[in-house]
Amino acid sequence: MRTFLSILFLSAFFMNSFSQKKDMISLWPGTVPGESKPKAGPVADTKTKDKVFRYAEVTDPALEVFIPEKSVSNGSAVIICPGGGYNILAYDLEGTEVAAWLNSLGYTAFVLQYRVPGKKEGALQDAQRAIRVVRNNAGKMGIDPDKIGIMGFSAGASLSARASTRFNERTYQAVDKADSLSCRPSFTMLIYPAYLDQGPENSLTPELTLSDKVPPVFIFETAVDPYCNSAFVMGKALRDAKLSVEVHILPQGAHGYGLRKGTRAGETWPLLAEQWLIETLNTGK
């Protein structure tokens, strides 16, 4: 029954992905760390002709908030990091559409507008700050501060992996009381991750330091994705470190499908992730 309902949700959420109650939270009340350019609203990429809405530039990092109906809310939250090679954000495909799906399952969702283009370290600052800001506001939003996770797609999965392993690293000076809180995510989902195999002989990138505090990780990938080695090396490293990890690899599916219907991979990972979330967070009804 749960699987059947999940399929119905996946068929319907595109129709109301922009009708959910939502709001914006600016992450940096003053100057953005390390930036001299004045803050402005995100700049849309108007040159693309496919069915993906992209942001080409973000100078004022923010969270777009998607709140589920009270009748299904489970008190858990997920920060979503869209992909785009750290150059753009595939904002609907790997952001708002995913938020609508999470809402249908009862999760409060936050789509992270992190700095692009070419702001890889700034993006980590944005992700760390986002986790702290959500945790600081958890009480008034009906969120359990110990059930705030992060997920990402492609480069967004790279960012999520860095946030999940470098949470003890102070990457910016404290702004307010939120920065006294932990920026460790409670759980992590990496969907067709990229850039995790930058070490010697395509091993795990040395910027990811594993410890026993790394949260449980869910990884989904396809064998034909040009970036599939990232999933392999991350999964193996977590397994070798005896950390909690679940890895799914399908034979077909390429890269960049989000959860839109039409590909087996895009239709499969949400069902697997839903069950993993239930088991990891004990959110089953």
What are these regions (language model features)?
Residues 91-110:
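Short amphipathic alpha-helix adjacent to the substrate-entry channel of hydrolases
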Residues 218-221:
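Short beta-strand/loop motif that positions the catalytic acidic residue
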Residues 20-72:
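N-terminal cap/lid segment of alpha/beta-hydrolase-fold proteins
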Residues 235, 239-285:
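C-terminal catalytic histidine-bearing segment of alpha/beta-hydrolase fold enzymes
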Residues 125, 129-212:
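Primarily recognizes the serine-hydrolase "nucleophile elbow" in alpha/beta-hydrolase
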Residues 89-92, 111-145, 262-266:
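Catalytic nucleophile-loop/oxyanion-hole region of alpha/beta-hydrolase
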Residues 74-83:
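Short beta-strand element of the alpha/beta-hydrolase
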Residues 1-23:
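Bacterial Sec-dependent N-terminal signal peptides
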